Amino acid sequence: MKAYTVEQGIVAPLDRANVDTDLIIPKQFLKSIKRTGFGDNLFDELRYLDEGYPGQDNAKRPKNPDFILNQPCYASATVLIARKNFGCGSSREHAPWALNEYGFRTVIAPSFADIFFNNCFKNGMLPVILDEETVDQLFKECAASEDYQLTIDLAAQEVKTPTGEAFKFEIDPFRKHCLLNGLDDIGLTLQNAGAIREFESKAKQSRPWVFQDLKA
């Protein structure tokens, strides 16, 4: 998993509350358990004017010109700001997969659904909770500048605006450690690879029958 230290990027404003996971990535695209192939269908119902289905050539689909991700100034956005209760609905991990593959590493909102919030950390993304007044300010500043950027400093736990104004955010120390060091569940386990091999070696001597191949 890619480490998250300091990220600076263009901000895309999704001025909508209660964005659920079905809106983030519709159910018809959930047949794959791979973590790739979802970016083109992120916010499918909002990005396109027709109904999406797996296997389509998205380049040929009619796009909604009013949706933020179809506007040139937000095409390379890596920071998403949204309203309260972002990621509500079903527990599909495909939602952070789609956001991540599109290019978003940070989502800023006043609140998140718990399962989506947890899934972000497992996929190298940082969900930042800021109060509604601060989020309102970010929306206003973003509307006033087409290339509005934010800098997110995880070590300092700060979101910095182009003027240098900084907003502090809270994060669990363990999750912070994992993001800073690029550790997902597998990476955490591999940190103890030596101890695991030592345990297995001792177990082979004390309980050799456990490691014997079963024969029909």
Swiss-Prot record:
Q: Which UniProt keywords apply?
A: Amino-acid biosynthesis, Branched-chain amino acid biosynthesis, Leucine biosynthesis, Lyase
Task: Spell out the Pfam families in the cross-references.
Answer: Aconitase_C
Q: What is this protein called?
A: 3-isopropylmalate dehydratase small subunit
Stored PANTHER family: 3-ISOPROPYLMALATE DEHYDRATASE SMALL SUBUNIT, 3-ISOPROPYLMALATE DEHYDRATASE SMALL SUBUNIT 2-RELATED-RELATED
Q: Which gene is the coding source of this polypeptide chain?
A: leuD
Q: Which GO terms describe its cellular component?
A: 3-isopropylmalate dehydratase complex
Question: The organism sits in which domain of life?
Answer: Bacteria
Q: Does the keyword Lyase apply?
A: yes
UniProt lineage = Bacteria, Pseudomonadati, Pseudomonadota, Gammaproteobacteria, Moraxellales
What reaction does this enzyme carry out catalytically?
Answer: (2R,3S)-3-isopropylmalate = (2S)-2-isopropylmalate
